Amino acid sequence: MATYAVGDLQGCLQPLKCLLERVKFDPAVDRLWLVGDLVNRGPESLQTLRYLYSIRHSLTCVLGNHDLHLLAAWQNVERLKKSDTLREIIEAPDADQLLDWLRQQKLLHYDEPRGIALVHAGIPPQWTLGKALELAGEVEEVLRDDERLKLYLDGMYGNEPNKWSKNLGGVERLRVITNYLTRMRFCTGTGKLDLKSKEGLGTAPKGYKPWFAHKDRRSRHVKIIFGHWAALEGRVDEPGIIALDTGCVWGGTMTLYNVDSGEYLRCDCADDGTLRPPAQPTKLIDQP
């Protein structure tokens, strides 16, 4: 039995299947962890979601911002953008089945025996793992509640409040939790977010750092696997932090990480998110 984690798919099914074939992934015995952003912008969002649903019993995945955007469009609380490739999902005959399954997924997963957390964007420095799991659970509960789902999805968009406070309530509370777990890149040591900057490590606004770079980060004892930040190209220079979004949908690579051995496997992608020939994944022993 092996456990593999893969970076943002964004509807790029060919590279995922190429990687899984290379490691001889067997859904009957192996596990696949996904860091979110399963769909959108790539060429096969519907096919990707259908494939993941077909192996759902072997799958652990967390939701990313694009997945939440899909749920909002499905519930008619947000219009699709010109760059979105989600309409085929919403109009598919099995849309309700797929998206009802999608909204059951977590925002934060913790594998206690391994001491590993799986999240789309990250855990803010002022939260312990326990606090992050507790607050993620608040959003997860609403996503699974038919009566509160639309209200949450309608109110989740926006950059304010830009910092957590225990006094927050209602949709503002859920929005900042969501932004930390699915959109965060740079923040201050007290968790004030900058959600506009999207480039690499050396581009932090004054007073801000990558969320994982704060020396007093309270989840430092936990190994964290995340995606979301393609500009990092998998490089974080921080022990115990595994960045898996390597920009497949932008013509970069898709990265698979063996959770137990620490080995990486990468597959080159074309600008449209398909395989770039020759489709021979490259094995990497050490962190990129």
Curated annotation (Swiss-Prot):
A Pfam entry, by short name: Metallophos
EC nos: 3.6.1.41
Catalysed transformations (reactions): P(1),P(4)-bis(5'-adenosyl) tetraphosphate + H2O = 2 ADP + 2 H(+)
Position of the signal peptide: none
MF (Gene Ontology): bis(5'-nucleosyl)-tetraphosphatase (symmetrical) activity
Keyword Hydrolase: yes
Coiled-coil regions listed in the entry: none
Record has Electron transport as a keyword: no
Domain of life the protein comes from: Bacteria
PANTHER family for this protein: CYTOCHROME C5 (PTHR40942:SF4), PTHR40942
Job description of the protein: Hydrolyzes diadenosine 5',5'''-P1,P4-tetraphosphate to yield ADP.
Family: Belongs to the Ap4A hydrolase family.
Protein name: Bis(5'-nucleosyl)-tetraphosphatase, symmetrical
Encoding gene, per UniProt annotation: apaH
